[in-house]
Amino acid sequence: MASQGTKRSYEQMETGGERQNATEIRASVGGMVGGIGRFYIQMCTELKLSDYEGRLIQNSITIERMVLSAFDERRNKYLEEHPSAGKDPKKTGGPIYKKRDGKWMRELILYDKEEIRRIWRQANNGEDATAGLTHLMIWHSNLNDATYQRTRALVRTGMDPRMCSLMQGSTLPRRSGAAGAAVKGVGTMVMELIRMIKRGINDRNFWRGENGRRTRIAYERMCNILKGKFQTAAQRAMMDQVRESRNPGNAEIEDLIFLARSALILRGSVAHKSCLPACVYGLVVASGYDFEREGYSLVGIDPFRLLQNSQVFSLIRPNENPAHKSQLVWMACHSAAFEDLRVSSFIRGTKVVPRGQLSTRGVQIASNENMETMDSSTLELRSKYWAIRTRSGGNTNQQRASAGQISVQPTFSVQRNLPFEKATIMAAFTGNTEGRTSDMRTEIIRMMESARPEDVSFQGRGVFELSDEKATNPIVPSFDMSNEGSYFFGDNAEEYDN
């Protein structure tokens, strides 16, 4: 994608930095993950967790959620103004799992948010370190993307459940900033905009007055974020129409759904970052590694290397398959929920199976689940190769569309074709090409029709040996061209419920 001079790399978005050179970026991202690690170590001390308990991913998630909740200004303000029964607005907590006499026990802890904020700032040189918080949000979002389906949310906004590959980042909180916006899929942005437009249709005052002015600014900003994800002129022109609409209504919703469908073939640019659980950074910091001095990148070899050398455990329910649990977390760590399974399998070095075939539920354990029968096992998060994460949709040629398959948004910059069922996608585009966006619609449909499923994306890009940290010898895998690799195929996962 032709990058404008003003574009910042994701690492800059991630660290809130202005333009920096590669070394500065690596140092500031290193500082960010180092701060997360220091915070985690301190929390383990506070909670008196053993080494094993500190490596338990469920404990990591509870600690991450506590710090996110402690810094959630808007919600904290809301909780103070609307006191609800049994919720202390000044406290945060969750389940911590400890091993007693060979059995796992659940212990509910409560902390002052103020205290958590103090520990976090102390670990981050006295600063709020919002970038680190966003990083944790993206890790949780990637975990949700790999674990749950969003069929219901898609249907509610009038979209087709088969468009799930466009839903990356759909559970990210609004406050996740530029780094969060970069990882949101086209479908996620479309859904946020449709919800906004629907509120405007139902509530006469939504766009009016001082509040309405702020709403309008937010609407236009979201439109611009979505526009920036599209790579063809016609899609961008349609976004301009949606943004400039005087009074957004059903016509805009139609246009947005049309654009979302078109993104199945004319894919948008969506960033991918390997965000790891806090306990992984904690382990590495505890071993004496200096992230800031060594530098770190979310899109290169570094996360692979960390996972190669860290042992993380997970609680396992009686009928779950530990290998499947590992696959789920591996995909979340690399933000690969929407990647082609052929590519993921090749990089991981073991077969990555569609979600419908996984014998595992989510990573988090509900408060009513029986701990008596819980076991724990090591998560296998290592890989055979590493590959560079991409922020492009893998379209073969800037203006011409490439093939896309219902359910792929590439994560790794690795050569492959993106098989798709053209008939299925094109069937959605019959009829309506009239109205003010008719010429753009016609142009978009023309580009989609010329797309070929056998076209190769990421020409010449390959994976690398884990010893090849400078990425000098790409190994270009050859894939069975017909075999399609959708993770969500034949899906039976549970829905994401807040």
Curated annotation (Swiss-Prot):
Specify the domain of life of the species encoding this protein: Viruses
Pinpoint motif Unconventional nuclear localization signal by residue range. 1-18
Q: How is it modified after translation?
A: Late in virus-infected cells, may be cleaved from a 56-kDa protein to a 53-kDa protein by a cellular caspase. This cleavage might be a marker for the onset of apoptosis in infected cells or have a specific function in virus host interaction.
Which Gene Ontology molecular-function terms are recorded?
RNA binding; structural molecule activity
Q: Where is this gene product found?
A: Virion; Host nucleus
Name the residue ranges of motif: Bipartite nuclear localization signal: 198-216
Q: Name one Pfam family in it.
A: Flu_NP
Disulphide bridges, residue numbers: none
Residue numbers spanned by region Disordered: 1-21
**Which example biological process does GO assign this protein?**
symbiont entry into host cell
Kindly list the GO CC terms recorded for this protein.
helical viral capsid; host cell; host cell nucleus; ribonucleoprotein complex; viral nucleocapsid
Q: Which InterPro entries match?
A: Flu_NP (IPR002141)
Q: Which UniProt keywords apply?
A: Capsid protein, Helical capsid protein, Host nucleus, Host-virus interaction, Ribonucleoprotein, RNA-binding, Viral nucleoprotein, Viral penetration into host nucleus, Virion, Virus entry into host cell
Positions in coiled-coil regions = none
Primary place of residence?
A: virion
Report the sequence similarity comment from the record. Belongs to the influenza viruses nucleoprotein family.
According to its UniProt entry, the function of this protein is described as: Encapsidates the negative strand viral RNA, protecting it from nucleases. The encapsidated genomic RNA is termed the ribonucleoprotein (RNP) and serves as template for transcription and replication. The RNP needs to be localized in the host nucleus to start an infectious cycle, but is too large to diffuse through the nuclear pore complex. NP comprises at least 2 nuclear localization signals that are responsible for the active RNP import into the nucleus through cellular importin alpha/beta pathway.
Subunit field text: Homomultimerizes to form the nucleocapsid. May bind host exportin-1/XPO1. Binds to viral genomic RNA. Protein-RNA contacts are mediated by a combination of electrostatic interactions between positively charged residues and the phosphate backbone and planar interactions between aromatic side chains and bases.
Q: What's this protein's name?
A: Nucleoprotein
Naturally occurring in which organism (per UniProt): Influenza A virus (strain A/Swine/Netherlands/12/1985 H1N1)
